[in-house]
UniProtKB/Swiss-Prot annotation:
Residues 21-36 have a biased composition (Acidic residues). The gene is BCP1. One of its GO terms (biological process) is protein transport. PANTHER family: BRCA2 AND CDKN1A INTERACTING PROTEIN, BRCA2 AND CDKN1A-INTERACTING PROTEIN. This is Protein BCP1.
Length: 307
């Protein structure tokens, strides 16, 4: 799938999500006459653009880190994402100068581990995984490898921090092409060996659980796609996904777990919108090796095919 770069003119070729034929338009008109509201949107894939995307990426980072967002220097993290020769994709609907609706990129954690903004992230995930011994030890091995002197018999393992976030109403079907393009870009980058040859990827994401409204008792649990996840609690908790592609990543992950945020900035009951349930968001951490990430992409494409 092709995408536009920042230096390409607006009339360049690009693969979009859908191109309507006359028959499709007729079908949509008939559906509209039956009372259904239909909005056609073409999603365009673009390279990262430092001149346009900085503030939107900051907002996506705040959204991604949830209630603990104030812990992080999102401005400096956005700068890292938008560094020269960075890789990643944004999705827009009104040209390259418009704000993105989604982003997928990767930060080299090994190369930037001593930068304060990234060290905060490392300290955070190590603190969160402290009660998951194997997960924590693996992360320490990977993220403290910078202090080891690589020799001919041993080398430091490289870790990439995947940043994936989108507007809440964006369909999951746009995600598999973004992951596919990301892996292709990392392979073809000029400094691919030095900068993007990762052994593992850490994915910071979000899940949530539905909680009964405080104003009334819930008569029955709401049906939804659920998962069982490991937490700091001794009993597994049923969660729903904000990012449904995480289902595939977790199936292939080395480790994954969910955690409470350090800061609860909004009462769960106040998050209710047209439902009898409140939403209690949780932090999700996924560690996946490079081969399993590559295997995940066709699985995503099969599970979430394009429109």
């Amino acid at each position: 799938m092709a995408k536009r770069r920042a230096d390409e003119p607006e009339d360049s070729d690009i693969d979009v999500s859908s191109t309507d034929s006359e028959n499709e338009l007729e079908d949509e008109q008939q559906q509209g006459e039956e009372g259904e509201d239909i909005i056609n949107v073409d999603f365009d894939y673009f390279d990262l653009n430092p001149d346009v995307d900085f503030h939107a990426i900051k907002n996506f980072l705040r959204q991604l880190f949830g209630d603990d967002a104030t812990t992080f220097d999102v401005s400096s993290l956005a700068d890292l994402i938008l560094t020269k020769n960075s890789v990643g994709t944004t999705i827009k609907t009104e040209g390259m100068e418009s704000d993105p609706f989604a982003i997928l990129s990767v930060i080299n954690m090994t190369e930037n581990i001593n930068k304060p903004c990234l060290k905060t992230v490392v300290d955070y995930v190590l603190q969160k995984t402290s009660k998951n011994l194997e997960f924590n030890l693996m992360l320490r091995k990977l993220l403290e490898a910078k202090d080891q002197k690589a020799t001919s018999s041993s080398k430091s393992l490289k870790v990439g921090l995947i940043i994936s976030e989108r507007m809440i109403n964006m369909p999951v079907e746009v995600v598999p092409p973004m992951y596919k393009m990301l892996l292709e870009e990392m392979t073809k980058a000029e400094d691919a060996h030095e900068k993007y040859e990762f052994d593992y990827f850490l994915v910071i994401s979000k899940v949530y659980k539905l909680v009964s409204a405080k104003v009334q008792d819930a008569e029955a649990p709401q049906k939804s796609k659920k998962k069982k996840v490991a937490t700091n609690e001794p009993v597994p908790v049923e969660m729903d996904y904000f990012h449904y592609e995480d289902m595939v990543l977790e199936e292939n992950a080395k480790y994954f777990a969910t955690y409470d945020y350090n800061e609860a900035r909004q009462d769960t009951d106040s998050r209710r919108v047209f439902t009898d349930y409140g939403i209690d968001p949780k932090l999700s951490l996924i560690l996946i090796d490079k081969n399993k990430l590559a295997e995940s992409i066709p699985q995503m494409e099969e599970k979430f095919p394009p429109f």
